[in-house]
Amino acid sequence: MLLPGMAMVAGKVMMDRNAPPEVLDTPQQGYDDSKALIARWRGTGSQRYAITPRFAITSTPEQLAMAGQLAREHPDCHVQTHLSENRDEIDQTLSLYPQARDYLDIYDRYGLLGRRSLMGHAIHLTPR
């Protein structure tokens, strides 16, 4: 329960690889589940919905594309994910997305960056 003056931004975590099988979804399942939750919770008092691919390591290009589609369909929603927490993570991420110029570029390519984007960590960023 939210107290007066409080707000919450939350969303279903989307992961379709590199995670325990019991928490994996598919790109379509993540899209469908998120869309249903957006319909249920968007604009409900102080609650805001965040489209939430966990991070690029646990999302295939297909899942990030569907998350980007959700962001385009629902521009009032936030997008929340992780970015550049440590150097090993960055190396692994860039090995999965070799076309990206840096970690942030992955999210940009899939339409996940905008004024409502929330990036957890963002410690080791590449100067541009």
Residue ranges of model-derived segments:
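Metal-coordinating catalytic core of metallo-dependent amide/deamination hydrolases
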Residues: L2-I123
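Short, intrinsically disordered, charge-balanced linker/junction segments flanking boundaries
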Residues: T126-R128
